[in-house]
Regions:
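A generic structural motif
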Residues: 37, 198, 231-235
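Generic non-transmembrane alpha-helical segments
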Residues: 51-54, 160, 164-168, 205-215, ...
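A generic structural signal for well-ordered coil/turn residues at beta-strand boundaries
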Residues: 98-100, 188-190, 221-223
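Short, surface-exposed ligand-recognition loops at beta-strand->loop->(often short) alpha-helix junctions
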Residues: 194-201
Length: 250
């Protein structure tokens, strides 16, 4: 993948890199990539799918952090919309399903559905947990009824939090401006990544200080902390985050 030197994170592979690899090795049968990444940066799945199919390869996408994509024009399209042959989504990460719940989506004729089911049967229990399966169906139903509104609420909440955080001196925030470079075609704004290097802390140190003060962040790395915003977050959550930042870091 490409690299963002400002935030110190890997971003996405480009369509050109995919085509170059397929040209070098005609025996490649599948392209596998992660989109979006943990920071909400999505690859150009539509173009990559077209390239993969041109060379006779299937496109498989790890979309663990994007089960909500496709429910709002404010978010990047889902990989299945863009022509991927299969994608795996962690329904429990962002949506309302219970922990451990995920979905595998398959479309088109490039993959054998029966073989996929046979392979899955080797890896899954013959006594599945019906509570987990019921929560998957409940999450699916919730999105079918109000997915658009839920996605819009999450985006609005994240945008508000991002604007408030931008008032603190020295903080750098990842925004939709990252799209268009480093292989990034779209940005999921519900992932609020904050670079804290200017404050003299590593992301890990800042995350621990926030945790001790009662604010749990989704991810920490060398220079950043990431806040995951969902449709259920509201004003009280922002107030708590901002109060802790003012108390601990300013």
């Amino acid at each position: 993948p490409q690299f963002d030197a400002v935030f110190g994170i890997n971003t996405q592979v480009t369509a050109g890199q995919i085509e170059e690899a397929l040209q070098k090795d005609p025996f490649i049968k599948a392209v596998f990539l992660t989109s979006p990444n943990y920071y909400g940066q999505a690859a150009d799945i539509k173009t990559i799918a077209q390239i993969a199919h041109k060379y006779g390869a299937a496109l498989l996408v790890d979309e663990a952090h994007g089960p909500h994509l496709g429910f709002s024009e404010l978010l990047p399209p889902s990989s299945m919309e863009c022509g991927a042959d299969a994608c795996a989504q962690s329904t429990h990460k962002i949506l309302g399903a219970m922990t451990q719940c995920s979905m595998l989506h398959v479309q088109g004729r490039r993959l054998d559905l029966k073989r996929a089911a046979d392979v899955m049967s080797l890896l899954t229990t013959t006594s599945p947990n019906y509570l987990l399966m019921a929560s998957l169906d409940a999450a699916r139903f919730q999105l079918a009824i109000g997915g658009g509104q839920m996605a819009a609420q999450a985006v609005a909440a994240a945008d508000r939090l991002r604007r408030l955080l931008q008032t603190f001196r020295g903080l750098k925030l990842l925004t939709e401006d990252c799209a268009g470079s480093n292989g990034i075609a779209g940005f999921d704004s519900t992932k609020v990544t904050v670079n804290v290097a200017a404050w003299g802390y590593t992301g890990i140190e800042a995350g621990e200080k926030l945790r001790q003060a009662g604010v749990a962040v989704e991810l920490t790395d060398a220079d950043n902390v990431l806040f995951l915003v969902t449709y259920s977050d509201g004003g009280a959550d922002y107030d708590a985050v901002l109060a802790v930042i003012q108390q601990v870091f300013t």
